Design a protein with these regions (language model features):
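Helix-enriched interaction subdomains in cytosolic or periplasmic regions
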Residues: 1-4
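Short, flexible loop/turn segments with low-complexity composition
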Residues: 182-193
């Protein structure tokens, strides 16, 4: 039901799909950028569904407490994550360890959608856990985009991380530097790797 509604909104607002999607996008870490609006999620889920992809995504477990909302978000592919502060002496896996474990134990291909900006507000340093996850899980990094200037969205390219993080991150920053977000003042590529 929700995916159907998202598709109606996608079409009604004039969005178009960039096709075809790389084959690697079925088992990957999928970077989604720019992320400056809650609408990005609606359009991204609709686009990826139309491309035949069913990515999973992480979300705070607190949202699962709302029965109807939690159920709908789970149906969209949510992976519930405990982001509460650790208690003294508590042992808990890092987000990267959790994600690698998901790939290692999955019996099917799995793509995990991540927004490395970590917020809809402008940041100049992206979170890099997605890179380490892809490297350790031995899965490609695929670059999904939403360009509000052209109303085009999709998965543009995939590549295997080489272990040379600086070089690989420069590829990612170069890819996103000309993509127009909904709110341009709220987006920046990671200045540490901008070419």
């Amino acid at each position: 039901m929700l995916k159907w509604l998202f598709k109606v909104l996608f079409k009604f607002n004039g969005w178009h799909l960039h096709t075809p999607s790389p084959v690697d996008a079925r088992n990957c870490i999928m970077v989604a950028a720019p992320h400056t609006s809650n609408w990005d999620f609606v359009y991204a889920i609709s686009a990826l569904d139309q491309l035949g992809l069913s990515p999973r995504f992480t979300i705070k477990k607190e949202f699962s407490k709302f029965p109807i909302l939690g159920g709908m978000i789970t149906a969209l592919g949510a992976i519930w994550i405990d982001r509460s502060p650790k208690k003294e002496g508590e042992k808990r896996l890092s987000m990267t360890q959790i994600m690698v474990s998901l790939f290692d134990t999955s019996k099917e291909d799995m793509s995990v959608l991540v927004t490395p900006e970590g917020t809809r507000s402008k940041v100049t340093n992206w979170k890099t856990g997605f890179y380490y996850t892809a490297l350790e899980a031995k899965v490609p990094i695929c670059l999904a985009f939403m360009d509000y200037a052209t109303h085009t969205t999709g998965v543009g390219m995939c590549f295997m991380p080489t272990g040379n993080m600086e070089a690989d991150m420069k590829i990612i920053m170069d890819y996103y530097k000309d993509v127009t977000p909904k709110y341009p003042s709220g987006f920046s590529t990671d200045i540490r790797y901008a070419g």
